[in-house]
Amino acid sequence: MTNENKHSDCSNMANQGMNDASSARKGSITHVIFDMDGLLLGINTEKFYTEVQEIILARYNKNFDWSLKAKMMGKKAIEAARVFVEETGISDSLTAEDFLEEREEMLQKMFPTSDLMPGASRLIHHLHENGIPICVATGTHTRHFDLKTQRHSELFSLMHHIIRGDDPEVKQGKPSPDIFLAAANRFEGGPVDPLRILVFEDAPSGVLAAKNAGMSVVMIPDARLDSTYHKVADQVLKSLLDFSPADWGLPPFENASTKLN
């Protein structure tokens, strides 16, 4: 989800109820893992990638569409770059490596302006204050992570740990479960049983990665993403503002004002 206005008509959004398997886990969730791009950091972060990739493709008289974006989301940079040049048919003119180098120059100037998604701060503070161990598992490499989060250091300091895409334990990007299994291993007293972990994701490949790791997943997809990608998730919501911790046996928001902030 990309803006607060989308929350105002949430009643029009088709919310997927939790399936039998995920409902059976209600009350067993003890730890939470967050993706970052498009989930905690949103509007600008994803928009930046899209804008840069549109500029590059325009040189070849090609368009960057959502079917291509969906295939790239959540993957490691080099893996997404290969999808980009191969799916668009420009691999003979632009290598994946050259694409990344060109994209990097433009992104360096954009990332420091990244904004938080609606509901992100509220949920993270709530879980932290109630003693629920939380972490971030993002395909973003350290150099980009530092740029994207520099305005939000206080919020990210609440995380027990942060796993980035260039972590040595992450051999393969999403939809491989590597990054979520690495995250589970590093909680205090870890590894944590995947059945006790709830993951928040926006990307189809990230949802698959979490399910491949044996974890439950709440998906907060961009409204433009084809709904066929929603099917794998245990729950689909329009925004983090719509998440009810009590649905998963987590401490509920104490009052209405907390819930809406």
What are these regions (language model features)?
Residues 2-29, 125, 141-261:
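Asp-based, Mg2+/Mn2+-dependent phosphohydrolase catalytic module
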Residues 10-70:
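Active-site neighborhood of HAD-like aspartate-dependent phosphohydrolases
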